[in-house]
Amino acid sequence: MKVDYLKKIEQCIAYIENNLTHKVYIDDVLESTYYSYPHFHRIFMDFVGEPITSYIRKRKLSCAAEELINTKKTIIDIALDYNFSSQQTFNRAFTGYFGISPLKYRNNGMLDDIYKPFNFKDCFFEELLSIPVSIERLQPMKVASYHSFNGNIKLKNSRQEQEKEISKAWGNLIRWQMSYEYQKQYGATKKLPATRELGKFMIDQNHHLPPYTRYFGFINPFPMNCNEFGYETWAMLTDISEHIKTEVQYKDIVIKDYDGGLYATSEATYGPDSNLDKVWKSLHYWLMQNQQYNYGEHQWLEEHITKSGEGGFHSFKLYLPIQPTR
């Protein structure tokens, strides 16, 4: 039986909007969805453009800002009304998001940077893309993994700070992989060259291309508060040398077994003008219109695509986990 996820997200948003002056717990928001937080969080984020935790905090602060301008309530009363533990806590959160204190915001006398409630009619369907979708099964694989996490993400510049964590995760994983592949070929006792030479070695040997390796990334964990963000990166390993694997050490690299799974896939562009978010949204909509499949519970993935003779990533392939509709 197909689940109407759009309706469930609307129900979640309605619950949040009706409880902004209360402590909003994730479990209460999800009560009507009957899905785990990791599963539903990704669907919510791709539709709405914000994690549930960030959406709640931005809406609370925006409603508080409106009351600063439109009412004569004291700042402490507004802080307590929106469930902040003290005026000091409210001041820090408000200043972190709006860039000025609640008092200065009130004195300016104008609403600015207000985060409005999400509206599907205005914000969802106009961004859908006509995309080709393929059904693919990823086979089990062994991967090297690096996980980057920041528990102090600033709400105002959250996207930029998240991008820093993603870059950090990829940088550390790729540095380990280059060292691993070099010493696998030349021996663990051979001195490692500079990073630029390691990169040239990888490209010359085509060690950065399928089927030799593939690169996947995903958000991990799903944040339990608006200041958390984590990203995990994978590099597929082939022809694994257990000896070299133990010799080439790098902090926080973990070797994992991935079980594989069934996916709906589509491609997205890379770079500053990437259509990644729109393609994810369009993949969701494709699945909602498809009666043969429903969401699967296995890992969501973004494959980062490489090119022959060039370093870096050049496009995405998105993997939406699916299962046959029961």
Where are the language model's segments positioned?
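A short, Lys/Arg-enriched amphipathic alpha-helix from helix-turn-helix/homeodomain DNA-binding modules
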Residues: 2-24, 57-73
